[in-house]
Structures are given as C-alpha cells and as structure tokens.
C-alpha cells in the first residue's frame, strides 16, 4: 500500500468518446496497493465535442478551448495535488499492479521521469524509449526507399529508437520516452513549467524531456512493468502526417536545427521523386509529381507551423 508520502495524481487528457476513459478509470480504481485517499483521478476535457460526463470521485477540468495534448496535461497538472503525476493516454490497458509496481521500481529513482514498457494489442514493442530527434532520424523516415527497413534493427536505429533501453530487463536510462504513459514527480514537472503549449500534437513530450535533461532529471524505461496501448497500432493519415511534420519543425526551430531540417527534407523529397519515377515505370498508379508536391506542401506548412 502506498504511504502518505506517495500520493498519486493521474491525469488523463480527453477528446472524443468517453467509454475508453471510463474503462481506464475503472482499472485505476481496481489497482492493488493504492487506497482511494492516495489516488486522485483528473480528466482534462480538451473542449471535446462530446463532453466528458460528471463522474463520482473524478476531478474534471473543462478547458475553454482545444489546445492539444500538452495543454490538456498542463491544465490537469495545475489541478493536481499528488506527489507523483501519472499521465495516461485514454486508450491504455493497465494491469492491476501497475501503480504499485512503478512506485517500487522508482524507489531508486525518486526524481526521475519514467515509462513502463508499452506494447500494442499484438504484444509487439512500440519502441517507447528513443533518442532525441536529429535531422538524420527525421530524414531517414522521410526517405521512401528506406520504408522496407522499418521493422528491422537497422530501421529502428535509423529512426532513433533506443534499442538498448527497449530490450533491457531492468530500468534503463534513455533520452526520452513516448508520452502514452509517463510518471514524474509533480515538483519535477513544475520545475520546467510543464509542457510547451506551442505543440498542438506530437513532440511535446520530446521537448519536455529535453528540458528535463538540461536540468539533470533522468528519463527511465521500466521494462518489468508493461501496459497495452491501443492507439499505437493505427496507421498515420495524411492529416496526422502534417501534424507530425509541423510539430517536428516547431521542435527543430526551438532547438536550433530548423534550417537544416528544411533543407534535408526538401532534398529527400526530390530523391523520393527520382525513386518514384522508377516505380511509376512498373506501376502507373504511382504519380511522382503528385507525391513530390504533397511532400513539399507538408514542408511548407510545417515551416509555417500550420496544421
């Protein structure tokens, strides 16, 4: 059972359908070793078209405008009173010992940000631990001929996945962990003033953890605790690709490599054009010019921070 020094505030950003969040709340209430007095559940409703229903024992923050993941987390954190913050995506499945196991693992890392191992519904790794993004990592993902290597060790390394951390059997430090499930002391969160709200969706957790790194806060993957993330299995739509591209340009501008990123992605788009010209000789449905124009538009909108 948690002690009075281990109070927990769970923050769940919400936008969309309430049902998955209600299921998640039920799993939180069923956690072993955690008393209701030590567990605060906060739902941050990010101006959802379907408002989150009033729920007994749940604190609901109703935002006046939609601001995205980082803004919703900040609003929830402002309401939180626990010693630890646990930030959860709504589409997670948690084991009944999730909180107690994370607390046990983090006893040796009292000032760290941590994530459990995150897997998809198929049980496969979602490569939760990653290296801070570089121009090379982003260009690698942009270059069409390399898509065939995505599931390989080479592909994971090229995209910046931290293979050593993701395959470790004990807690392992890394640059950053994806934001589906993060646990961090509230005082640590407040030291860097939380998430940068310029990021609407994507990269906010990367920037947050880079600022934590600057003040010496460890970022840890706890592989002996596993959660299942439904959303990670979905394929990116064209709109999601724009969100990701724009977020990466905001991040690159903030951390000093926006011009290099723009040049690299533009050159890579023209390299893709050459590759697609060859593809179009065998497959007349491939339109190299259309693909090039689409990629250049993604870059143009990204540099203007447009979603």
Residue ranges and their predicted role:
Residues 63-80:
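Glycine-rich, basic loop-to-helix element that forms the pyrophosphate-binding segment
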């Amino acid at each position: 059972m948690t002690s009075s020094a281990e109070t927990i505030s769970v923050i769940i950003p919400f936008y969309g359908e309430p049902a998955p969040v209600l299921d998640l709340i039920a799993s939180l209430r069923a956690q072993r070793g955690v008393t209701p007095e030590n567990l605060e559940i906060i739902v941050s409703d990010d101006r959802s078209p379907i408002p989150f229903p009033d729920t007994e024992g749940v604190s609901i923050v109703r935002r006046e405008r939609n601001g995205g993941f980082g803004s919703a987390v900040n609003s929830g954190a402002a309401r939180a009173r626990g010693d630890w913050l646990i930030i959860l995506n709504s589409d997670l499945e948690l084991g009944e010992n999730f909180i107690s196991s994370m607390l046990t693992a983090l006893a040796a890392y009292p000032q760290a940000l941590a994530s459990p191992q995150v897997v998809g519904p198929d049980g496969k790794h979602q490569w939760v631990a990653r290296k801070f993004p570089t121009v090379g990592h982003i260009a690698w993902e942009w270059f069409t001929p390399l898509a065939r290597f995505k599931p390989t060790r080479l592909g994971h390394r090229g995209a910046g996945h931290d293979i050593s951390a993701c395959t470790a059997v004990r807690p392992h430090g890394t640059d950053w962990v994806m934001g589906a499930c993060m646990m961090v002391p509230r005082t640590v969160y407040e030291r860097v003033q939380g998430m940068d709200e310029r990021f609407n969706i994507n990269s906010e957790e990367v920037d947050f953890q880079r600022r934590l790194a600057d003040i010496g806060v460890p970022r840890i993957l706890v592989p002996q605790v596993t959660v299942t993330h439904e959303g990670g299995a979905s394929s990116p739509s064209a709109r999601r690709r724009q969100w990701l591209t724009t977020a990466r340009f905001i991040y690159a501008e903030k951390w000093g490599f926006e011009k290099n990123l723009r040049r690299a992605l533009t050159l890579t788009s023209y390299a893709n054009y050459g590759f697609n010209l060859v593809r179009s000789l065998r497959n007349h449905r491939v339109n190299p010019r259309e693909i090039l124009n689409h990629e250049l538009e993604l870059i143009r909108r990204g540099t203007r921070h447009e979603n």
